[in-house]
């Protein structure tokens, strides 16, 4: 098989997050996948992106569909790339989790940590305990997903969009 052919794989892949990196990744996946569903939280943003087919300096590939229904995304995509800021990651996982099954594969591209404050003491004068979690740990805590990975740079979405050489690492405990 010639791996350079467009739309080589007849699968639908999901990307959560319409920021620069989420859009760049959706376009990159669109080169090899039949269809990419790009999830936007805002219906207004989704309408605008579907109409203009442009997000900042990114032109959006024809086979990328911008959606606002997270249950539809989980139903249609076994492979999902959550690409949202770390401050919103746990909330996003809580919204997505009811629709996920153990067979889903999540490869997050979120930099940073989840800082979870909990005040376990009944004494309000005592400081809160801060727990620090990776995004992979948040996925495990908030969902039934078993296969989890992480995609990381060094890469810049503008370089990816411009088809410049870029490097990424995908790490996981699983071989897929």
Features from the language model and the residues they span:
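Conserved residues at beta->alpha junctions
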Residues: 40, 83-84, 172
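Short loop segments at secondary-structure junctions
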Residues: 43, 143, 172-175
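Conserved anion/nucleotide-ligand pocket segment
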Residues: 160-176
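Rossmann-like NAD(P)(H) cofactor-binding subdomain of soluble oxidoreductases
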Residues: 67, 72, 79-165
